[in-house]
From Swiss-Prot:
GO cellular-component term (any): cytoplasm
GO terms classed as biological process: protein folding
GO MF annotations in UniProt: unfolded protein binding
Record family assignment: Belongs to the prefoldin subunit beta family.
Signal peptide: none
Key words of the record: Chaperone, Cytoplasm
Compartments where located: Cytoplasm
Function: May play a role in chaperone-mediated protein folding.
Name of the molecule in the record: p53 and DNA damage-regulated protein 1
InterPro entries according to UniProt: PDRG1, PFD_beta-like
Self-association state and partner proteins as the record states: Component of the PAQosome complex which is responsible for the biogenesis of several protein complexes and which consists of R2TP complex members RUVBL1, RUVBL2, RPAP3 and PIH1D1, URI complex members PFDN2, PFDN6, PDRG1, UXT and URI1 as well as ASDURF, POLR2E and DNAAF10/WDR92.
PANTHER family, per the entry: P53 AND DNA DAMAGE-REGULATED PROTEIN (PTHR21162), P53 AND DNA DAMAGE-REGULATED PROTEIN 1 (PTHR21162:SF0)
Length: 133
């Protein structure tokens, strides 16, 4: 039987370890999705170079190749890119929250600038006008 102090330390370590595992799993998933996104980008680039729109193209699905019409293939890859972009963005938002919880559990201060968002087009134009004037 563990002493109350040892049990408290053990619970703390288990909590920190679980939070760290969640952070690492999300990071790994982001890397995997980004790899797939880059492969799609390569495929789209190859389709753009191929000017014969009337011909069917070979597409690899897992371990199987399928012949598909050029326009449908391009549309399918673009939809997949949009889905991957949204999924990666969602994971990044979740990752920020999980990292904050991990730092809180470890007693570390919150990361400065970690929750910043980029300027949109209108904000950027306004900033340029202010800096020029």
């Amino acid at each position: 039987m563990l002493s109350p102090e040892a049990e408290r330390v053990l619970r703390y370590l288990v909590e920190v370890e679980e939070l760290a595992e969640e952070v690492l799993a999300d990071k790994r998933q982001i890397v995997d999705l980004d790899t797939k996104r880059n492969q799609n980008r390569e495929g789209l680039r190859a389709l753009q170079k191929d000017l014969s729109l009337s011909e069917d193209v070979m597409v690899c699905f897992g371990n199987m190749f399928i012949k598909m019409p050029h326009p449908e293939t391009k549309e399918m890859i673009e939809k997949d890119q949009d889905h991957l972009d949204k999924e990666i963005e969602k994971l990044r938002k979740q990752l920020k929250v999980k990292v904050d919880r991990l730092f809180e559990a470890q007693g570390k201060p919150e990361l400065k600038g970690f929750n910043l968002n980029p300027l949109n087009q209108d904000e950027l134009k306004a900033l340029k006008i202010i800096l020029k004037g």
